Amino acid sequence: MASIDPAQLVFVDECGTHTSMTRRRARARRGERARGRVPRNRGPVTTLLAGLSLAGMVTAMTVEGGTDTAVFAIYVEHFLLPALRPGQIVVVDNVGAHKPDRIRALIEAAGCLLVFLPAYSPDLSPVEEAFSKLKTFIRAAAARTRAALDAAIAVALSHSQ
């Protein structure tokens, strides 16, 4: 990996968001309690699939619910592949949805290479750090509907460029 140009790497992963995300800390005047509202019901999970390169976020897609092979294949085929250039290296973690031969075939047909991270090593993927920053922005937005959550994700992604 030492001989690889970092500009060729595209890290792809997914993260979950929901409509009850709120800031974890608050401020208040001395002697007063910090107050905030948090819904009791988390609502359905909205999964964000995104790719990160040295130039910033490559492409993103949201879907209600979790990620399986079919959802990941749609993301790769309709969102990631149009944004890739031949010769780029797509780096993913070892989730089962990333491993089918169809995913590898799609990426290699575009002239790119698919590489898997070692098991249990999310700290090797910089997209995890980007998701942490995105989630901080989404918590501050306090989106309580799916439409508001999608809008907050779009704004957060635009700030990450």
Predicted regions and their residues:
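Short functional hotspots at interaction and active-site rims
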Residues: 1-161
